[in-house]
Amino acid sequence: SKLTTPESNDLNKMLNQMNLAGCDFSVMEVSSHSLALKRVHGLHFSFAVFTNLTPEHLDFHGDFENYLTAKKILFDTLPVSSSAIYNIDDLHSIDVVKDCPSLKYSFGTKSDSQFKISEINCDLTGTSFTINYENKNYALRTSLVGDFNAYNAAGAFATAKLSGLKDEVIAAGIATTPQVPGRFEILS
């Protein structure tokens, strides 16, 4: 798609094709634009992950408050049976999830994180880090470079863990996630 989140007709067509092909899960990035324009209106998400909020897209939203309000739409409309997973280290995360009716799970480096990130180490081949969840440490590595990718992977880890996936499947998925062309890509 040319858009981060496709137009609703295109998105529903893709999701239907995936369903007909036997797909049980879909993972997608839901942009603030798509929330404001109701591209995902009517979809019921089992999980939503909030990674961070920085002053972007103000040309579209007009100001930071409108941008924050757009981001909140996904969380405010989650079904009670869903889970909201959020980066507790982000200054705006509490504002984003405060009105969310679903279960809430935090990730980050703060001591009160439910999925606590520690020991982040980056080099040109990727990022390694540890997540502590329910008093168990999980040593993880991704080929994606940067502390922010440890945070992104922690959100994915939390989602997968809460979905009931096996630890080795989660670790393998994080380890084999390919680089996205043009996104903090290492060039040789």
Task: Write out the residue ranges for each language-model feature.
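Short hydrophobic/charged patches on amphipathic alpha-helices used for structural packing
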Residues: 15-16, 37, 72
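Conserved nucleotide-sensing/catalytic segment adjacent to the nucleotide-binding pocket
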Residues: 2-31
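Conserved helix/coil segment N-terminal to the catalytic DExD/H
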Residues: 34-41
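Short, flexible, glycine-rich and Lys/Arg-enriched loop motifs at helix boundaries
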Residues: 1-2, 42
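Acidic, Mg2+-coordinating active-site environments of NTP-dependent enzymes
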Residues: 19-23, 27, 45-188
